[in-house]
Amino acid sequence: MSKDQIPVENLTELEASSELAFLAAELARHDALYHGKDAPEISDADYDALKRRNDAIEAAFPALVRADSPSKKVGFTPLPTFAPIVHARPMLSLDNTFSEEDLRDFVSSVYRFLGHLPDDSIAFTAEPKIDGLSMSIRYENRKLKTAATRGDGTTGENVTANIRTIKEIPNELPADAPDVVEVRGEVYMAKSDFLALNAQMEADGKQTYVNPRNTASGSLRQLDANVTAKRKLRFFAYALGEVSNGGQPARIADTQYGIVEKFREWGFPVNPLMKRFTSAQQLLEHYNEIGVARPDLDYDIDGVVYKVDRLDLQERLGFRSRSPRWATAHKFPAEQAFTTVENIEIQVGRTGALTPVARLTPITVGGVVVTNATLHNADYIEGIGNSGERIRPEDHDIRIGDTVIVQRAGDVIPQVLDVLLEKRAAGAAKYVFPEKCPVCGSHAVRERNEKTGKLDSVTRCTGGFVCRAQAVEHLKHFVSRNAFDIEGLGTKQIDFFFESDDPALSIKTAPDIFTLKARQEASHLTKLENIDGFGKVSVKKLFDAIDARRAIDLHRLIFALGIRHVGETTAKLLARSYGTYEHFEKAMKAAADPASDAWAELNSIDGIGEVVARAIIEFYKEPRNLDVIDRLIRELQPKEAEKPSTEGSPVAGKTVVFTGSLEKFTRDEAKARAESLGAKVAGSVSKKTDILVAGPGAGSKLAKATELGVQTMDEDEWLALIGG
């Protein structure tokens, strides 16, 4: 992974985009090792930390969410060894919760989404999260028909023969069971059975197994079911997939708790620690009780799962791309360890951010050898958080030679939590943060926030385009997959061209890419085709690929510019709104005047808030940016943006504002429905507003809409307009 880690809140658009690309590839690799080969390289806590980092970046930069995002995936593509089975209902994973605050946020989000429900009126179930292998067992006419692993959430592996060897799983259901029912749960190996198996393996002179989870997964994937039968696998049932009678959807209970009780009646093992509560405090207390009992359980668990109990509320809450809104997994804390800070090195990020990294005496944390830990910024070294609060006692600054507590949780690189002062060497010098960039030697400064007057927590290099650490990353972003995506011009090639000072080869800014062919043709000395790694055919392909990108989609061009806060989705919004690059650039220059119509129009675009708008305007106010763009546009023919078709929609292309207390749907539901019909939902009323939907308590927005002559309607009229 990249070493120049900085806190999510301090990432720039380019830094976030690059790290999301890394995380997508890294998580996919670990998924393949964990789900496909049962040979993980990292602990569950480390994997969760990677996912948390990915999710945190996506939450901070929603416009950068990738098509191959780990947040859209579940599990791993099924292996070809087993026949595939398509799940009748997807087997989604759960979002993770790591703290009391996260838990309370989850409960609050449920109430917020449902709306108009009194406190403590929603019941939640809480049960141990079994560290095993998720399974869906399908019964037809009450007989076990098939069994499939989760796989990628849509398609799993057919392990029916192996599942039949697990004695705890019924081969037939009672007469009151529906015609079709999918029972979902976790296959696991008990700790006692695992120890006995390893003892036998050792006695036989064979290699022992690493842990119960991997052993259970490997045992279930045996091609010979007789091997599986000898492994003493077990099962806990906890959820339903498809349920139907006579081809029509059916229910066996109205609550999650009732489903588990029905499983018990049918003969399935269910977890005895599952309970039902109505407050976040009760859930937290049960979480702590399970944590205390954890060492004495005969099975591995890595957290507690909370679910909204009523199935009708689950249906209203629905799903995100890969997880339900009505459930979360509260994970247990990661492990900590003690080690020594051997050195503190400075890494320079893509926009000049100077990030200190502690080089540590190697130590094993959670089954992984740790040698580095992020120190975030100068304040963190001193024990001060990003909001200015003290996170460690005043004399607990981090120094070279200190013995420190390291934890792997919540970040890709481990964090140094605290210092053991009693082990600090006499005369240990305080760490002095550098005042110059270690890459280019330019001054490094902490900018002052114009609104708050506070110093930024991040120290940045002022070198700009003269600093290699920044300029080369701008180029890599420009040619990245969601930007210009030029075949044959990847990160390795960009490094080569950027490092060259030969006028016939050098690429320092984006326009240089499109003049490379002409410079090569004019050169009598340096020919790219004669350089190692290139050839006549590959050079021709590269030039053809560059020429093919001269006619570029408008949203790709806008995204490629690397404007802070402008990701792929935001770029598409801007492209659809302005149509052509000429119109876009002209509008951005005009929007520098906050009293202008251009400023109002920019802010009215759904998804473009004031922070994004100001970042775009500041970008177009910088003369050096305009110089690069002018040279770039002379080499391109940007395409006009295509406008989406929403044929038949009465609100397609209209700008809609919702205000007041909505009673028939939540604000999120209203926005989602309007956008699905092609409407643009804005947060404020302007001359561009077409419809104002006003609920009880509508105030200034209704008054302004009336003043501007905007069409207004109540919820019933809105529902009648869009067809309910």
From Swiss-Prot:
Q: Which domain of life is it from?
A: Bacteria
Entry keyword annotation includes Ligase? yes
Annotated active site: K129
Q: Where does Zn(2+) bind?
A: C437, C440, C461, C467
Q: Name one GO biological process term.
A: DNA replication
Residue intervals of the BRCT domain: 646-724
What does this gene product do?
DNA ligase that catalyzes the formation of phosphodiester linkages between 5'-phosphoryl and 3'-hydroxyl groups in double-stranded DNA using NAD as a coenzyme and as the energy source for the reaction. It is essential for DNA replication and repair of damaged DNA.
> Which of UniProt's keywords are assigned here?
DNA damage, DNA repair, DNA replication, Ligase, Magnesium, Manganese, Metal-binding, NAD, Zinc
- Tell me which NCBIfam families the record gives: dnlj, PRK07956.1
Broadest EC class assigned to this enzyme: ligase
Q: Which cysteines are joined by disulfide bonds?
A: none
Q: Name one Pfam family in it.
A: BRCT
Identify the gene encoding this protein.
ligA
Q: Which family does it belong to?
A: Belongs to the NAD-dependent DNA ligase family. LigA subfamily.
Residue positions annotated to bind NAD(+) are D44, A45, D46, Y47, D48, S93, L94, E127, R150, E186, K307, K331
MF term (GO), any: metal ion binding
Which PROSITE patterns does the UniProt entry name for this protein? BRCT, DNA_LIGASE_N1, DNA_LIGASE_N2
InterPro entries found in the cross-reference section:
BRCT_dom, BRCT_dom_sf, DisA/LigA_HHH, DNA_ligase, DNA_ligase_AS, DNA_ligase_CS, DNAligase_adenylation, DNAligase_N
Q: Which reaction does it catalyse?
A: NAD(+) + (deoxyribonucleotide)n-3'-hydroxyl + 5'-phospho-(deoxyribonucleotide)m = (deoxyribonucleotide)n+m + AMP + beta-nicotinamide D-nucleotide
Essential cofactor(s): Mg(2+); Mn(2+)
Q: What is the lineage of its organism?
A: Bacteria, Pseudomonadati, Pseudomonadota, Alphaproteobacteria, Hyphomicrobiales
Q: What is its EC number?
A: 6.5.1.2
Q: Which Gene3D superfamilies match?
A: 5' to 3' exonuclease, C-terminal subdomain, 6.20.10.30, BRCT domain, DNA ligase/mRNA capping enzyme, Helix hairpin bin, Nucleic acid-binding proteins
Q: Which GO terms describe its cellular component?
A: cytosol
Q: What is this protein called?
A: DNA ligase
